[in-house]
Amino acid sequence: MVNRFVLNGISYHGKGAIQELPGLVKAKGFQKAFVASDPDLVKFGVTKKVTDIMDAEGMAYEVYSDIKPNPTIENVQSGVAAYKASGADYMITIGGGSSMDTGKAIGIIINNPEFEDVRSLEGVAPTKNRTVYTIAIPTTAGTAAEATINYV
């Protein structure tokens, strides 16, 4: 059974919830995803479960898997450069707090280019523009990183 919970966005949860992805993306009219994950989730096939669904639907994406535990400023900057180079128009984050927080930081800098890096965002609220549209696919419980606009 798929359930729906609304907070900052819409949360689908329950068995088969990932199958909602293609319909959601198509309804929004997005063309290409920037899929932010970590190397272990790629290595163990977790990210592939998502990209297999996307492949079956002919959805374009690029995987960025250089996210480290407790990501650094440089890690976020690398992600910003990769997002820009990808030509993506939305983001999918897969993982725990590190992937979610890195994705949120990347997205806010992409849509607010007046900020050079995450340090320049400290204490700034609200930003001029919202973050890049992001679909969060958590693989852990407890951080709530997928449900908040903040990143640490």
Describe these PLM feature segments.
Residues 1-90:
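ATP/NTP phosphate-donor binding region
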Residues 74-152:
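Glycine/threonine-rich beta-strand-loop-alpha-helix active-site module
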